[in-house]
Amino acid sequence: MKGKNVILSLILISCFILFGYYYKSMYVSNSIEAINMKAMNKKYVYPLGEIVGIKATTDGVLVIGYEEENIEYIGGIEKGDNIIAINDIKIENVQDISEILEDVNEDEVKITLTRDENCIDENIKLKKYGKDKRLGLWVRDRISGVGTITFYDPQEAVFKGIGHAIIDSDTNELLKIKQGYIYKPKKLNIEKGTNEKTGYLYGDFDLKSPIGEFKCNSNFGITGIYNSEKKKSTQLMEVGSEKDINLGKAYILLEDKNKNTVSYDINIIDISTDEQSTRQISIEVTDDRLINYTGGIIQGMSGAPIIQDNKLIGAVTHVIKDNPKKGYGIFIEEMIKLENKD
């Protein structure tokens, strides 16, 4: 943050287990500009603000803890490691572990795991409970939560959202996603944020009909295939760069309980040039309608598009824990760079 070294307590504003005015009218009003956007060196996308349920399975199983701190049972395995094989047999979920261990006659097994893109083998002792055998590790193979889709890119035919990584709530590690899906809500509920507690979005989602899927999970969000009709109700908007961002008035987009996309006024109060941070844009909610509705920025709003001077410039990522009216966002350029994984 320019000229300041302030230590603040922050919360990533997406939930993992792990609204008033409609769009402002200053959009690109037709597709003619989109046809010429390459020649004009401009990029156009559909800003969304669509709240979605998120479910994903991990690549292998994630180690989130130990039954006991005993080197015999954990070896060199660390929290946040991804187990991908036992005795050279590939595993994809927790059930695979149980099935493999049923056929093991030895007291030890070889665990193959990945850590920081490296493949590592560790031999550990099994725990025995009568005839049952199991690892002395706590593991997870799936996550679920709520987040917001930032935009749909018609050139790349992908969505991008959340603005920060989906992380494991126990290890705080970025999750390696094998397959993820997004779902539209059947019902949305709000737990309002206060200075004493962070609010959050929750609800029921239509899990029978995913509106998109993804495999890419990066420090700057997720990206994948998008099947929702939501983009048809919006218009193309120019993507702004860091140099287009100014201090002062802007607004964010977010769905309300009736699935209408609504704009809410904010102020941009500071801008950082740290390219590795997800706290590049400091924002403050000034719209009484949003403050009365949610208390300000709450979990599940991560990914809400930030718009200024008719350009999509960023996405909301964090809330300040003891002041829900204030938070942070990321430059939209960081999300544009995300590549989809087939």
At which residue positions do the language-model features occur?
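Conserved PDZ fold ligand-binding element
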Residues: 74-95, 307-309, 313-318
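Serine endopeptidase catalytic core focused on the charge-relay Asp
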Residues: 128-295, 299, 308-309, 317, ...
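PDZ/PDZ-like groove recognition
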Residues: 48-78
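PDZ domains, with a preference for the canonical peptide-binding region formed by the helix
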Residues: 85-118, 323-334
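Gram-positive cell-envelope targeting signals
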Residues: 1-45, 52, 149, 327, ...
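A short glycine-leucine-enriched loop at secondary-structure breakpoints
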Residues: 71-82, 103-105, 296-300, 305
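Short, flexible surface segments
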Residues: 59, 79-80, 246, 302, ...
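PDZ-domain C-terminal substructure recognizer with occasional recognition of PDZ-binding tails
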Residues: 31-37, 42, 98-137, 267
